[in-house]
UniProtKB/Swiss-Prot annotation:
Its EC number is 7.1.1.-. Keywords: Cell membrane, Membrane, NAD, Quinone, Translocase, Transmembrane, Transmembrane helix, Transport. It comes from Geobacillus thermodenitrificans (strain NG80-2). This is NADH-quinone oxidoreductase subunit K. GO terms for cellular component: NADH dehydrogenase complex; plasma membrane. It is an enzyme of class 7 (translocase). It is a multi-pass membrane protein. The keyword Membrane applies. NDH-1 is composed of 14 different subunits. Subunits NuoA, H, J, K, L, M, N constitute the membrane sector of the complex. It is found in: Cell membrane. The chain crosses the membrane at residues 2-22, 28-48, 62-82. NDH-1 shuttles electrons from NADH, via FMN and iron-sulfur (Fe-S) centers, to quinones in the respiratory chain. The immediate electron acceptor for the enzyme in this species is believed to be a menaquinone. Couples the redox reaction to proton translocation (for every two electrons transferred, four hydrogen ions are translocated across the cytoplasmic membrane), and thus conserves the redox energy in a proton gradient.
Length: 101
C-alpha cells in the first residue's frame, strides 16, 4: 500500500467517526465514534512514520502512546457514563444538559 492509500483509509475512518459523534444521541456510540477518530489519527502517525521523509520509530511510539491515552480516556468516559446512568437511568446525550439534581 502507498501513503495515499493509508491517508484515504484514515480520512474515511475519521469522517465516519465525526459523523457518528455529531449525529448520534447514545453516549456509548458517541464514545465509540471518538475512539474511531483517534484510531484514524494513529493510522496517520504510523503511515507517516513509514513513508515520511525521515522514516523511523517515532510515529510508532507516538501511536502507542496515543492508544494508551485513548484507553484511559475511554475508561474515564465509561465511568462517567455509568455514574450518569445511575442518576438519570438513561444514556442519551439530550439528557446530559440537565445535570442538576
Amino acid at each position: 500500500m502507498t501513503l495515499s492509500a493509508y491517508l484515504a483509509l484514515a480520512l474515511i475512518l475519521f469522517c465516519i467517526g465525526l459523523y457518528g459523534a455529531l449525529t448520534k444521541r447514545n453516549t456509548v456510540i458517541v464514545l465509540i465514534c471518538i475512539e474511531l477518530m483517534l484510531n484514524a489519527v494513529n493510522i496517520n502517525f504510523v503511515a507517516f512514520a513509514k513513508y515520511g521523509a525521515h522514516p523511523g520509530v517515532h510515529g510508532h511510539v507516538f501511536a502507542l502512546f496515543a492508544i494508551a491515552i485513548a484507553a484511559a480516556e475511554a475508561a474515564v468516559g465509561l465511568a462517567a457514563l455509568i455514574a450518569f446512568y445511575r442518576n438519570r437511568k438513561t444514556v442519551q446525550v439530550d439528557e446530559a444538559n440537565s445535570l442538576k439534581h
